[in-house]
Amino acid sequence: MEINKFRALSRRAQQLHYTSLNGLKRRCNNAHGAANFHSLKRATQTQIQKSQTKPLLKCGDSDIKEWNVAISSYMRTGRCNEALRVFKRMPRWSSVSYNGMISGYLRNGEFELARKLFDEMPERDLVSWNVMIKGYVRNRNLGKARELFEIMPERDVCSWNTMLSGYAQNGCVDDARSVFDRMPEKNDVSWNALLSAYVQNSKMEEACMLFKSRENWALVSWNCLLGGFVKKKKIVEARQFFDSMNVRDVVSWNTIITGYAQSGKIDEARQLFDESPVQDVFTWTAMVSGYIQNRMVEEARELFDKMPERNEVSWNAMLAGYVQGERMEMAKELFDVMPCRNVSTWNTMITGYAQCGKISEAKNLFDKMPKRDPVSWAAMIAGYSQSGHSFEALRLFVQMEREGGRLNRSSFSSALSTCADVVALELGKQLHGRLVKGGYETGCFVGNALLLMYCKCGSIEEANDLFKEMAGKDIVSWNTMIAGYSRHGFGEVALRFFESMKREGLKPDDATMVAVLSACSHTGLVDKGRQYFYTMTQDYGVMPNSQHYACMVDLLGRAGLLEDAHNLMKNMPFEPDAAIWGTLLGASRVHGNTELAETAADKIFAMEPENSGMYVLLSNLYASSGRWGDVGKLRVRMRDKGVKKVPGYSWIEIQNKTHTFSVGDEFHPEKDEIFAFLEELDLRMKKAGYVSKTSVVLHDVEEEEKERMVRYHSERLAVAYGIMRVSSGRPIRVIKNLRVCEDCHNAIKYMARITGRLIILRDNNRFHHFKDGSCSCGDYW
């Protein structure tokens, strides 16, 4: 009964499709009729599809053709299991049956099932081999495709073209050429595939040689080579080639117009636009996009308003112009009147709001999206991450996974960046594992995000291991490692990386020299740092900016050369900013130069009156000098100006759970155990020679109370908890939102020595590696 029903519906649908529609089409001679025709055609095709997906359950039917049609119908709608049930119930199989199953499996991503069925075929025809090879090529598994290709009993031009196109589309140009040269017979597809391979991989010299070696190229081939010149920004050669074309179509004109626009020659582009004998919506869109790329948004809008018709690309191009110019009000007005929006439209608006810091507007649009793609998720995650909403970014990443969103490199990169910001090393490692499992190569884009995550999370060794494995390294990769080792206090290692980078032929940039000067500062290499600073313009073309000067002030200040540092600031080609004055203030505190510290502080308070950190630095210097009256005055000044000291917090991640501590923390569920452990540890530290530095504590407090107050600082509580709960042999990683206090720094050195643990503390300035009673910072931070 089921098979008869299927036959009747199928015949009825086919009759309607091939007879009624053809007759109707002949009668549709106007635009309205054509629209009706296409509408009816779509409706009929839907009816056919529904009729062809009826299940076939009756056994013993001898009409193999109808069984094969049913298999094809199920496979087209992704119902592989139903197709397999039909296949198993067939009275017999033909090569068409097998090929339908194999191609269906491949279309639905079931490569193992396709290969299994292919291997089980009692007899394969040429179509079977070609289908299987094409499936591997589409999946970019060229190795498997090549294996099958080499053992084929016979090949036709389709077989050769499949391998040729596979190599061409995946950038294997030499392999594509090898296949091309071996082909016993070539057709237009073969020649165009190789030409496209050369063009897509920017091998224009080879493309031109191939083009000259043959006559009678089709227009599509001429346009392909023209597009290659444009892609390489060889606009002169593109124009010469364009002028030599005997026949041009709208694609030719659109390509050359785009080329001029992308090269910044917008007037020439407009002249070609006006001369174009035929213009379609893409011609107009190319010109609008050209204006936008050249920051001529008003001209773009004027042309946009004149367009005889617009498509989604046109609307999105104009929208992107407003977003790039951060004119979000105009973008919103355009967005609201758009007759058609696709996922790219929504993504553009979300990205625009996020980049302008309007994260709530971005999230509001994100929630309203009818459909999201990986770019949508990545844009929203990046928006949260870049605006400092780190935990929201991670929460959204987890939500994306739960909802089945497809991960891409951008979403991984944003999530890794967020892990770096909140120092979530364990989560970062899990993401690294997901990347490896997902088959993502550790190339520059994702690899650099991983490097930064490991460096910022205090795992410089794992960063180094990853760096060695990276397939491709760019200037960002090297800069990350140089800056990472520098910030961790291993300046000499950082400088070795710098020398290696130069040997690799990479030219240092601004960021490189900031990291190098910082490494010299942390290592105490004053003369070497001066040499780099005064020769980097001549040697590398890097002009000193405020960051480079700040590094030099830190270098000189760290060495106690405070007057030299101050004189350097006086001779700067621009006024020192608050960061540079803050560096001088920090150096003055370390070396006890109160007068220079006050000068620096006054400058900072004028620039950043609410910078509580600088008040604290100066207050600590006064306290260390016993100037308690000045401490009191400074606190009154802070109160009058409404400046509040940022509370200090420290946290540690243990088994994917973050434990946060404040000074004298009374809320942690294990506080009694932690305090008791600290009391016991404090006794052992004193026996080893530790003396509490209480000079920064208020002078009207008893000495014993002073010791108790510094003992329960947040960083010491976090370190103690880490010693208690992190298994032996693993480093203890603690983060503090402020600069570590002098007494805690000294105490943690003793804690590391007594317990034999490696303690890595990241404060708001740098990393401290405590081991065997010493710190990588050399007691200067």
Curated annotation (Swiss-Prot):
Belongs to the PPR family. PCMP-H subfamily. Residues 687-781 are annotated as: Type DYW motif. This is Pentatricopeptide repeat-containing protein At4g02750. One of its GO terms (biological process) is RNA modification. PPR repeats lie at residues 63-93, 94-128, 129-155, 156-190, 191-217, 218-248, 249-279, 280-314, 315-341, 342-376, 377-407, 408-442, 443-473, 474-508, 509-544, 545-575. The gene is PCMP-H24. Residues 656-686 are annotated as: Type E(+) motif. Residues 580-655 are annotated as: Type E motif. GO terms for molecular function: RNA binding; zinc ion binding. Keywords: Repeat.
